[in-house]
From Swiss-Prot:
This is ATP-dependent Clp protease adapter protein ClpS. InterPro entries: ClpS, ClpS_core, Ribosomal_bL12_C/ClpS-like. SUPFAM superfamilies: ClpS-like. Pfam families: ClpS. NCBIfam families: PRK00033.1-5. It comes from the Bacteria. Involved in the modulation of the specificity of the ClpAP-mediated ATP-dependent protein degradation. It comes from Bordetella petrii (strain ATCC BAA-461 / DSM 12804 / CCUG 43448). GO terms for biological process: protein catabolic process; proteolysis.
């Protein structure tokens, strides 16, 4: 904290540091399609979202049965980067896998 002196009353006043609000968070949601193999979805969840085998399989099954599954919650820039990485990786391997971000 910084201090300033009020010369009229000889009182030291401390100013609190400015606090910034946390960034808005977004969930990255993987969408189901009829063409991407389940094993590929598990690999994507492990590679880009740091999921272990068990969590990746659980999310993949949620995507398969419910049509969508949350991969993680991130600040906007991180979420957008992960989505772009997944899209590029899937496209390069001839898979139509898609994910989107939604505000939390």
């Amino acid at each position: 904290m910084s201090s300033t002196l009020d010369t009229q009353h000889d009182v030291a006043v401390e100013k609190a540091p400015a606090r910034t609000a946390p960034p808005p968070m977004y969930q990255v949601v993987l969408l189901n399609d009829d063409y991407t193999p389940m094993e590929f979805v598990v690999k994507v969840l492990q590679k880009f979202f740091g999921k272990n085998q068990e969590d990746a399989t659980r999310i993949m099954l949620q995507v398969h049965h419910e049509g969508r599954g949350t991969c993680g919650v991130y600040p906007r820039d991180v979420a957008a980067t992960r989505i772009a990485q997944v899209a590029q990786y899937a496209r390069a391997r001839q898979h139509p896998l898609q994910c989107v971000m939604e505000p939390v």
